[in-house]
């Protein structure tokens, strides 16, 4: 920008414009006069130090002591002290239950640093040698040494973990047997106790009967691949630090390492056996197997659906073919029976009709003009009848018999005329000649 250039600015807002655009939304409440005093725990602590003429560290130490003493007075459920524990030899400190010494048996590995400090202070206040000296027990400081040793162990994270590794009083033994209803109630505390040794946190819970297959698999996979920080240095045999024999020292260190490895292997085997036992009695595993079996059967059923449909179709086709074959066989049998009956009926009818013809010849004396026909006459009539009978077509024998029956009442001439009619019919038809007959149609 050159010196000759200029910038145009907006005119400033006037007071009138500001007042015109102002919109009040409320009023400020009236002022009230109140008394203000310094309060709070920090002010009270400052006032207390000023009043008693204490330094900061002196005041803090006395307040902690007073607080512990108040807690000691208020707590009515302090652990009872075993008389045998009170007589314990401080030299045998590895044999003592450090949590019991400090009155933390019900907390054990769950006790936090603050609880350990408070418990130690309470025990010190109760069993300090100066306090016992006032009671006449001048040299009775054995249990106080046990208290100091317990606090020394439990206040050191490394040494406390070593003690927790072998603290059998914190273990929960697995149940000998369970039912579907008691499995979770009895096994959950067992796994919660074992979970304290896990490097991986949080540890998956045992769950419930409603847990999914994935959750159950994850739980047992975790325990079968359990990564434990548990060690067994606490059980090491003490190595004398007398400098007399380095070989003995190295030997004892080697022996301690070997024992730690053996204890670790035994503990791993114990834990695996524990998990095996839980898995074998877990009601969910049986349930999952039943569900898997049902799902497998369902998949097989679906997979074989085509084969079943084909088999059903083949069976249906077979049944249809068998039905048709049975119907055809029945129809054939029925037709055969009907045909047989028809043949038998026809045969009977022919036999009956032939009998009518034969009886007609006898009844009308072979159409002889004399009372006793000659043999030649009878023979010629019979031959003519045989010729006529041989030329009869389908149904014509019945017609012949019917015509004879119809004319029998009229007499011999009428019956003879029936034979004549049939003979002439056959001659006209060409099935025979006039020479083929001697008596009829002449």
Swiss-Prot record:
Q: Where does it sit, as one GO cellular component term?
A: cytosol
- Alphabetized UniProt keyword annotations: Chaperone, Cytoplasm, DNA-binding, Phosphoprotein
Ranges for domain J come to 97-167
Q: Which GO terms describe its biological process?
A: 'de novo' cotranslational protein folding; cytoplasmic translational elongation; regulation of translational fidelity
Protein's recorded name: Zuotin
Q: Per its UniProt record, what Pfam families does this chain match?
A: DnaJ, RAC_head, ZUO1-like_ZHD
* Gene Ontology MF term list: DNA binding; Hsp70 protein binding; ribosome binding; unfolded protein binding
PANTHER family from the UniProt entry: DNAJ HOMOLOG SUBFAMILY C MEMBER 2 (PTHR43999:SF1)
Protein role: Component of the ribosome-associated complex (RAC), a heterodimeric chaperone complex involved in regulation of accurate translation termination and in folding or maintaining nascent polypeptides in a folding-competent state. RAC stimulates the ATPase activity of the ribosome-associated pool of Hsp70-type chaperones SSB1/SSB2 that bind to the nascent polypeptide chain.
């Amino acid at each position: 920008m050159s010196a000759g250039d200029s910038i145009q600015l907006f005119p400033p807002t006037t007071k009138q414009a500001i007042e015109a655009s102002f919109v009040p939304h409320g009023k400020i409440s009236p002022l009230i006069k109140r008394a203000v005093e310094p309060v709070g725990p920090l002010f009270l602590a400052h006032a207390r130090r000023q009043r008693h003429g204490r330094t900061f560290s002196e005041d803090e130490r006395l307040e902690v002591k007073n607080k512990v003493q108040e807690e000691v007075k208020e707590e009515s459920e302090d652990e009872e002290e075993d008389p045998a524990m009170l007589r314990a030899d401080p030299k045998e400190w590895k044999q003592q239950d450090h949590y019991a010494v400090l009155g933390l048996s019900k907390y054990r590995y769950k006790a936090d640093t603050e609880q350990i400090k408070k418990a130690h202070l309470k025990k010190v206040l109760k069993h300090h040698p100066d306090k016992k000296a006032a009671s006449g027990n001048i040299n009775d400081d054995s249990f106080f040494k046990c208290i100091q040793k317990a606090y020394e162990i439990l206040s050191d994270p490394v040494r406390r973990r070593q003690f927790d590794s072998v603290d059998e009083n914190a273990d929960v033994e697995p149940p000998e047997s369970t039912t579907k209803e008691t499995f979770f109630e009895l096994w959950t505390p067992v796994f919660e106790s074992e979970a304290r040794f896990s490097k991986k946190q949080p540890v998956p819970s045992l769950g419930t009967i409603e847990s999914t297959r994935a959750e159950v698999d994850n739980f047992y996979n975790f325990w079968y691949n359990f990564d434990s920080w548990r060690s067994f240095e606490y059980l090491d045999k003490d190595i004398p630090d007398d400098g007399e024999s380095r070989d003995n020292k190295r030997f004892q260190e080697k022996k301690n390492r070997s024992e730690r490895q053996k204890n670790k292997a035994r503990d791993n085997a114990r834990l695996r056996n524990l998990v095996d036992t839980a898995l074998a009695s877990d009601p969910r595993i049986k349930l999952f197997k039943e569900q898997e079996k049902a799902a497998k059967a369902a998949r097989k059923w679906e997979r074989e659906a085509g084969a079943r449909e084909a088999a059903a179709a083949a069976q249906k086709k077979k049944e249809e073919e068998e039905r048709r074959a049975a119907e055809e066989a029945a129809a054939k049998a029925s037709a055969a029976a009907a045909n047989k009956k028809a043949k038998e009926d026809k045969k009977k009818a022919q036999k009956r009709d032939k009998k009518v013809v034969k009886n007609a010849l006898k009844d009308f004396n072979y159409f002889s003009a004399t009372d006793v026909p000659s043999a030649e006459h009878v023979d010629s009539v019979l031959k003519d009848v045989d010729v006529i009978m041989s030329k009869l077509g389908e149904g014509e024998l019945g017609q012949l018999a019917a015509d004879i029956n119809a004319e029998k009442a009229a007499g011999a001439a009428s019956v003879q005329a029936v034979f004549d009619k049939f003979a002439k019919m056959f001659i006209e038809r060409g099935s025979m000649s006039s020479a083929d007959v001697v008596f009829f149609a002449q």
